[in-house]
Curated annotation (Swiss-Prot):
GO terms for biological process: translation. One of its GO terms (cellular component) is cytosolic small ribosomal subunit. One of its GO terms (molecular function) is structural constituent of ribosome. InterPro entries: Ribosomal_uS2, Ribosomal_uS2_bac/mit/plastid, Ribosomal_uS2_CS, Ribosomal_uS2_flav_dom_sf. Belongs to the universal ribosomal protein uS2 family. NCBIfam families: rpsB_bact. Keywords: Ribonucleoprotein, Ribosomal protein. The gene is rpsB. It holds the Pfam family Ribosomal_S2. PROSITE patterns: RIBOSOMAL_S2_1. PANTHER family: 30S RIBOSOMAL PROTEIN S2 PROKARYOTIC AND ORGANELLAR, SMALL RIBOSOMAL SUBUNIT PROTEIN US2M. This is Small ribosomal subunit protein uS2. It comes from Dechloromonas aromatica (strain RCB).
């Protein structure tokens, strides 16, 4: 989970966008400009990153759910892999409007997806006429692509982690409406409005995206392992008392 400024530098986290496309609201996080490209102040990024990771770890330690969101080309694979590693839900293809604000309807689609997967496992596809099987398979693939990453999400997430806030304005608006905190990577060309935990930095480089996503996944795993340690510690005391009682 811990990241150094050197690692951020090597991942290109400090490279912002062209100065003419900047958002003045990101001024506090900008160090300066080089060759008409804004340079992000990594001292501030590191502090904000650590603050965000502490929040994620605390949330995970209280069994909270963090939804990973990264649907642009260079983020998709990384987001999916890191979310799976952390056992967290994710959206890596397209954000469907109402994914949070209309979660009741999404749950119906999740049930449909799970039922279809059960049918495939049971060999139902082989029993269908060719045309019907083709239609079934197409629907299944469409559902897997759009909501496969959230099929184990029983309810609304406790927070969402977003790569590129400008690219996911709808997701952030929905989260804001429902009071769900947003952890967001915000580049120099976007506004940090609506983002509770801002990570100022490059949102285009795959190495930078990997650094953020790995950090969030690690923080979730650390938070969860803290829960296990606490349970074991509590259980260990009980067991000790029982053994003592039995001995007497």
């Amino acid at each position: 989970m811990s990241v150094t400024m050197r690692e951020m530098l090597e991942a290109g986290v400090h490279f912002g966008h062209q100065t003419r496309f900047w958002s003045p609201k990101m001024a506090p996080y900008i160090f300066g400009a080089r060759n008409k490209i804004h340079i992000v102040n990594l001292e501030k990024t590191l502090a904000k990153y650590n603050e965000a990771m502490a929040f994620v770890k605390k949330l995970a330690s209280s069994r909270g759910t963090i939804l990973f969101v990264g649907t642009k080309r260079q983020a998709r694979e990384i987001i999916g892999e890191e979310a799976l590693r952390a056992g967290a839900p994710f959206v890596d293809q397209r954000w469907l409007g109402g994914m949070l604000t209309n979660f009741k309807t999404v749950k119906t689609s999740i049930k449909r997806l799970k039922d279809m997967e059960v049918a495939v496992e049971a060999g139902e596809l082989e029993k269908m006429p060719k045309k019907e099987a083709l239609t079934f398979r197409r629907e299944l693939e469409k559902l897997q692509k759009s909501i496969g990453g959230i099929k184990e999400m029983a309810g609304l997430p406790d927070a969402i982690f977003v790569i590129d806030v400008g690219y996911h304005k709808i997701a952030i608006t929905e989260a804001e409406k429902l009071g769900i905190p947003v952890i967001g990577v915000v580049d120099t060309n976007h506004s940090p409005d609506g983002v509770a935990y801002v990570i100022p930095g490059n949102d285009d480089s795959s190495r930078a995206i990997q650094l953020y996503a790995r950090g969030v996944a690690d923080a979730i795993l650390e938070g969860r392992s803290q829960v296990v340690q606490d349970i074991v510690a509590a259980g260990g005391d009980d067991e000790f008392v029982e053994v003592q009682d039995a001995a007497q």
